[in-house]
């Protein structure tokens, strides 16, 4: 391990111990996050936050915070993730054995209780280094306006930050279908005693850009989504239907959500490509033209040390005039779902697992969490029209493919700053001709991730 990383770890452990000292236990907490970071947790109102100090000062109870007044402060953030991976069998195009999967710095905070902001920078992404750069005006809890560069309000898992995921890898369907960061304007809020949250926005369309991590396939007449002539519209609503006194307490936290997004892909561009867990292609690009529609639903239950999650997503790309005779073809259809569960075996509530009751080096071992997930992704033509399946990108019935993935893992939280994740991933493809290695349909991957968040 590099000397500078060792020094960082030692300093972080000292900071973690100091951060939980009784003298700092009453410091102010981070305010309500905007809906773009939905995690299923109730959002506290900044006016309810306790504040004991006055004047300009530093607060290190959670992370470095410069407090300018009771309601104005700046948080300085650092997020690091380092991965080690092994594969069996080894794919034709394997991912790197080791990688910094996340190196992000940023600031976030609020100016009075009515304005909050964030700016984060990805160190390892020279093409698009800026992640969230936005300002959120919140005159009322029921009506807030957010503008800048942030996540499109779509998909519970996509809106969950990378350091808060239960698994080392996002579900493949979420990565493929759900839009990510884009520049736009969004109206959002929470109503009905916070049982309902909503968001609706219009965006520039950069979230429809083809994945920049993989080279563009050289298909004749096909170009990537490099210009964004049409806007992307999206909305999301979440509801806690059982949040009533007559309902058992463990059921009140059930939350369901629904979302949709609408955009347009012009002729000469190509649609979604099926990608495996580590980005290898198992369904190539095809010709598309027309409307791009996304929709989905999800549900979550957190009760004590247990959490259960389900999400379904679907995406459709029209193929107008893309046949060999310039005729319209059936839509390109991508569908995915996953079911996931987590249980904290050391007894902490799931909502509090990142702050173990007995941290390492302070009389305990930290918190241990067991997790499991099954996910399913299919991609092909929406209709066959009685035609045989074909690998041609202009065929009526595109030869589809399916990826089924099982993941089991263990998460260790030694203290509030560190997390260690170990995942075993089994991936199976339906079409043996289009997998990660010719003739093989089943692959295993093993990942160890060390995470540090300040």
Task: Give residue ranges: language-model regions.
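Alpha-helix capping and helix-loop boundary segments enriched in small/acidic/polar residues
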Residues: 175, 224-225, 398, 438
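Outer membrane beta-barrel
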Residues: 61-216, 225-266, 333-384
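Cleavable N-terminal export/targeting peptides
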Residues: 1-47
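Outer-membrane beta-barrel pore domains
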Residues: 29-31, 35, 45-53, 90-92, ...
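A residue-level signal for conserved active-site and pocket-lining positions in enzyme catalytic cores
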Residues: 14, 237, 410
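Intrinsically disordered, low-complexity regions of eukaryotic proteins
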Residues: 6, 16, 47-50, 61, ...
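Active-site rim elements
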Residues: 213, 219-225, 323-328
């Amino acid at each position: 391990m590099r000397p500078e990383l060792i020094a960082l770890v030692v300093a972080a452990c000292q900071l973690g111990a100091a951060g939980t000292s009784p003298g700092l236990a009453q410091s102010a907490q981070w305010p309500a996050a905007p809906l773009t970071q939905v995690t299923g947790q109730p959002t506290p109102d900044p006016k309810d936050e306790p504040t004991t100090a006055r004047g300009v000062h530093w607060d290190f109870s959670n992370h470095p915070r410069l407090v300018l007044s009771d309601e104005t402060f700046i948080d300085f953030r650092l997020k690091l993730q380092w991965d080690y991976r092994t594969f069996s069998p080894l794919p034709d195009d394997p991912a790197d054995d080791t990688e910094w999967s996340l190196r992000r710095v940023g600031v976030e905070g609020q100016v009075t209780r009515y304005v909050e902001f964030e700016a984060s920078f990805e160190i390892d992404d020279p093409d698009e280094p800026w992640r969230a750069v936005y300002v959120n005006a919140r005159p009322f809890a029921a009506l807030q306006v957010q503008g800048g560069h942030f996540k499109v309000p779509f998909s519970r898992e996509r809106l969950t930050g990378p350091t808060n995921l239960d698994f080392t890898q996002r579900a493949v369907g979420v990565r493929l279908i759900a839009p990510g960061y884009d520049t736009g304007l969004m109206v959002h809020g929470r109503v009905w005693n916070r049982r309902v949250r909503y968001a609706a926005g219009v965006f520039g369309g950069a979230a429809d850009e083809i994945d920049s991590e993989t080279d563009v396939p050289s298909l004749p007449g096909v170009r990537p989504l490099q210009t964004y002539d049409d806007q992307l519209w999206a909305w999301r609503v979440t509801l806690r239907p059982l949040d009533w006194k007559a309902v058992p307490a463990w059921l009140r936290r059930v939350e369901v959500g629904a979302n949709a997004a609408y955009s347009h892909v012009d002729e000469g561009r190509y649609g979604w490509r099926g990608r495996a867990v580590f980005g290898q292609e198992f369904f190539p690009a095809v010709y598309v033209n027309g409307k791009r529609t996304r929709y989905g639903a999800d549900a979550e239950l957190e009760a004590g040390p247990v959490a259960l999650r389900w999400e379904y997503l679907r995406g459709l790309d029209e193929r107008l005039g893309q046949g060999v005779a310039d005729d319209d073809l059936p839509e390109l259809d991508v569908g995915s779902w996953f079911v996931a569960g987590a249980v904290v075996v050391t007894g902490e509530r799931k909502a509090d697992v990142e702050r173990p009751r007995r941290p390492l080096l302070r009389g305990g071992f930290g918190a241990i969490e067991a997790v499991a997930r099954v996910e399913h992704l299919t991609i092909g033509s929406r209709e066959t029209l009685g035609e045989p399946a074909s690998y041609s990108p202009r065929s009526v019935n595109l030869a589809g493919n399916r990826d089924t993935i099982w993941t089991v893992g263990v998460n260790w939280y030694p203290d509030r700053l560190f997390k260690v994740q170990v995942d075993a991933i089994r991936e199976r493809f339906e079409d043996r001709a289009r997998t990660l290695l010719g003739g093989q349909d089943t692959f295993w991957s093993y990942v160890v991730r060390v995470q540090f968040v300040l």
